[in-house]
């Protein structure tokens, strides 16, 4: 007989409000999946900071129904260079009195909670009473050796091959006075952090119960679109692009087809990688 032991969960009594702040650029293919994922688990509001180029994609039409229902608010950050930290501070400063918790995940980061189907129940546990923010480790979903985009859900396309990493993303408590956020991972050294089990000094990395599925790469085509557009933190130099490409092949299978595709789309010579394949 199989014995299943569920964790003992002690909840606070009060109702809480949860929002999500995210910087988004060239995410029209995936943004609905992202919104529906967090809506399904009980998030009250999503603040989407539109960081597309001035003449680039636009969220207003594709998100019109969510905007009408006031579930989504789009904030104009179009054309801004490396504005991630500025976005986090702006979102928190304007809204910290209205929400108990702020999810500060990227647009390709999907939280997984094994024992909860509602994030409010998870966050309302007494184990988090003394935590200023809760950190979740990320597990990269590999490219599944897919070169091109497919019009399917991310979970269908990249359902296996999880690569765990040591970096994490936070869910931050609201109503912290005069808070200045300095980083996207460790927000502020003065804040008390806890892991997803409420422990402040436990460095155990969990990738099975409470963690983030990080669809950072997707297919080779989509990864290179990400590389070419840049991110919200670093300047998009050739050196930065090359660092990301090396990281891509550290985690995903290196093939000549992928290398040739990346060279063609970035204009960066990857001869040193081709030599590794021939060895």
Each language-model region and where it sits:
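Short, acidic, metal-binding catalytic loop of nucleotide-sugar glycosyltransferases
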Residues: 36-45
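Short beta-strand-to-loop acidic/aromatic patch adjacent to the donor-nucleotide binding site
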Residues: 99-112
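Catalytic-site signature of metal-activated, phosphate-bearing donor transferases
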Residues: 84-89, 113-279
């Amino acid at each position: 007989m199989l014995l299943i032991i569920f964790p003992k969960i002690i909840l606070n009594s009060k109702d809480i409000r949860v929002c999500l702040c995210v910087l988004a650029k060239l995410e029209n293919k995936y943004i609905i999946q992202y919104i529906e994922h967090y809506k399904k688990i009980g998030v009250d509001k999503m603040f989407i900071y539109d960081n597309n180029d001035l003449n680039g994609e636009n969220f207003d039409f594709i998100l019109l129904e969510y905007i009408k229902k006031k579930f989504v608010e789009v904030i104009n950050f179009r054309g801004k260079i490396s504005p991630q930290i500025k976005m986090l501070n702006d979102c928190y400063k304007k809204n910290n009195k209205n929400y108990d918790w702020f999810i500060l995940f990227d647009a390709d980061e999907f939280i997984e909670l094994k024992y909860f189907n509602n994030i409010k129940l998870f966050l309302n546990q007494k184990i988090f009473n003394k935590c200023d923010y809760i950190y979740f480790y990320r597990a990269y979903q590999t490219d599944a050796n897919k070169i091109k985009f497919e019009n399917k859900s991310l979970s269908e396309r990249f359902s296996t091959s999880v690569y765990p990493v040591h970096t994490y993303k936070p869910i931050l408590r609201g109503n912290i006075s005069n808070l200045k956020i300095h980083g996207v991972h460790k927000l502020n050294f003065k804040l008390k952090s806890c892991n997803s089990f409420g422990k402040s000094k436990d460095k155990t990395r969990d990738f099975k119960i409470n963690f983030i599925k990080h669809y950072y790469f997707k297919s080779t085509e989509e990864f290179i679109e990400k590389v070419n557009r840049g991110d919200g933190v670093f300047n998009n130099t050739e050196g930065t692009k090359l660092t990301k490409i090396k990281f891509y092949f550290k985690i995903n299978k290196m093939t000549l087809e992928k290398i040739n595709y990346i060279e063609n789309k970035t204009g960066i010579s990857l001869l040193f990688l081709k030599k590794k394949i021939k060895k």
